[in-house]
């Protein structure tokens, strides 16, 4: 069991990179140094809850975007997605750090709110963004869809038009369509929070949803800031491989123990 987890990783040259065994391993080291030793285009999905830099805590220090994107863009496959959780004001900084590759956001609607100290001045906060970046259209497996036995027709609706419009000049949608698939996902994900083993731990269900959406079974997901190992747990539950880094020894050990508890006893 112990061979899955390493406290250090020796530096590797270009030749050694291709032979590195990093699948289903969490490394206790700085992620920027660690990612530099991964092969080019070796990762199917990058999923990470980066430090937001909004709490002043030691573990919440911002990573340098230039160095982070240099490694992310080198190791992600051409059809891979980079999915990063965030909340304002960090979201604006994150999107501005790579505007050409930013595509859209999901919105995690939380059942637990924050911001009570400022409740008389601003609304309580119950949403975090999940920002999606990619070079080329990635794997996309929409979750929760229903496939019908027979196609249904969706008629284009006539609407008033004036000035610029996304509709045709005659005021109608482009055309009627037939489909066998309904209930495509919307941007808002209502998933309950988890009281976890890390101050900012995300729900396993949220990460499972993202992993199943942007990867296929057997592919590999990298989390550069593993925390308590939620990404690894979600990968195991989803039939995907994981790899990643956590520099804090206590959180690293928590992640290791969490993953071990899910693996069959030899």
Role assignments for model-derived ranges:
Residues 2-254:
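Core catalytic lobe of class I
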């Amino acid at each position: 069991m112990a061979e899955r987890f390493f406290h250090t990783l020796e530096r590797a040259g270009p030749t050694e990179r291709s032979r590195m065994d990093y699948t289903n391993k969490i490394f206790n080291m700085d992620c920027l140094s660690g990612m530099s030793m991964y092969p080019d285009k070796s990762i199917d999905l990058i999923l990470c809850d980066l430090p937001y830099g909004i709490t002043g805590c030691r573990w919440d220090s911002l990573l340098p975007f230039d160095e982070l994107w240099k490694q992310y863009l080198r190791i992600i496959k051409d059809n891979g997605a980079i999915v990063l959780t965030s909340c304002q004001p960090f979201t604006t900084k994150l999107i501005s750090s790579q505007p050409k590759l930013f595509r859209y956001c999901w919105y995690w609607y939380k059942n637990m709110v924050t911001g009570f100290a400022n409740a008389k001045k601003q609304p309580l906060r119950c949403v975090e963004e999940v920002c999606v970046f990619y070079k080329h259209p990635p794997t996309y497996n929409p979750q929760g869809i229903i496939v019908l036995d027979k196609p249904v027709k969706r008629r284009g609706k006539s609407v008033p038009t004036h000035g610029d419009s996304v509709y045709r000049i005659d005021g109608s949608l482009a055309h009627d369509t037939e489909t066998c698939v309904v209930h495509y996902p919307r941007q808002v994900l209502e998933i309950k929070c988890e009281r976890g083993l890390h101050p900012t731990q995300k729900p396993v269900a949220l990460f499972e949803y993202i992993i199943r959406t942007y990867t296929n079974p057997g592919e590999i997901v990298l989390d550069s800031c593993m925390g308590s190992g939620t990404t690894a747990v979600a990968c195991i539950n989803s039939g995907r491989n994981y790899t990643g880094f956590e520099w804090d020894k206590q959180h690293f050990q928590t992640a290791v123990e969490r993953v071990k508890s899910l693996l069959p006893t030899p």
